[in-house]
């Protein structure tokens, strides 16, 4: 998977299910290019068990959900589902055992309060489904949506901002401009500051 897939496999599949392989392959851009090549238009890529928090040395990488959201959004795919789930491993303290998994829907920014040490001992993994729609690509480099939100917040402080429905919006959305009253921006800013003082909890 570090190399391009053979041409005879390109566009042959309506679904590619990736269940914990991504983290073991060094060249991630090539893997995403391969997924794009394998799936026919209208087909789906499913990431079924992408390791996130507390998977040290399991593979080359642990993934933030923003990777999948930002990559597929930037490349014009339609994201059907994004979830993150907490779990203890099946083999736990010498016993084959698993407590119920806590599964939550992911939206950009929902984990900001937990970004640094907020999950404790819990393991977290990801589930993502993306559809290859007409015009979708795999070669656009995404801007991390965290910094897109930060940049938009700075623009709001100046008074006039683009109104996007998504932190990583298509270029065409720039045409949809709007202004936000300054007092509403300040109110939102203070609400965010107060929220940081509250105990951390999952959405």
Regions found by a protein language model. Give the residues of each.
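Conserved SAM-binding loop
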Residues: 1-57, 66
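Membrane-proximal basic amphipathic "stem/tether" segments
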Residues: 152-203
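Flexible, glycine-/basic-rich loop-and-beta segments that form/coincide
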Residues: 89-168
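Short beta-strand segments enriched in hydrophobic/aromatic residues
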Residues: 49-51, 86, 134
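Conserved Class I S-adenosyl-L-methionine
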Residues: 58-85, 93-103
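Residue-level detector of flexible, active-site-proximal loop/helix-junction positions
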Residues: 3, 84-89
């Amino acid at each position: 998977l570090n190399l391009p897939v053979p041409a005879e496999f390109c566009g042959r599949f309506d679904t590619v299910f990736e269940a914990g392989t991504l983290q073991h392959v060094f060249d991630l851009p090539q893997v995403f290019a391969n997924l794009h090549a394998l799936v026919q238009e209208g087909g789906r890529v499913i990431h079924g068990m992408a390791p996130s928090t507390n998977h040290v040395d399991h593979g080359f990488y642990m993934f933030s959900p923003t990777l999948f959201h930002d990559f597929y959004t930037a490349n014009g795919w339609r994201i059907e589902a994004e979830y993150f789930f907490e779990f203890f491993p099946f083999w736990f303290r010498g016993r084959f055992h698993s407590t119920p998994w806590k599964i939550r829907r992911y939206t950009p920014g929902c984990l900001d309060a937990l970004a640094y040490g907020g999950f404790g001992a819990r393991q977290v993994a990801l589930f993502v489904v993306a559809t290859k729609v007409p015009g979708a690509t795999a070669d656009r480099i995404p801007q991390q949506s965290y910094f897109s939100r930060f940049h938009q917040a700075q623009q709001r402080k100046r008074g006039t901002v683009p109104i996007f429905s998504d932190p990583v919006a298509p270029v065409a959305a720039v045409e949809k401009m709007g202004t936000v009253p300054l007092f509403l921006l300040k109110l939102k800013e203070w609400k965010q500051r107060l929220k940081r003082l509250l105990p951390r909890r999952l959405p």
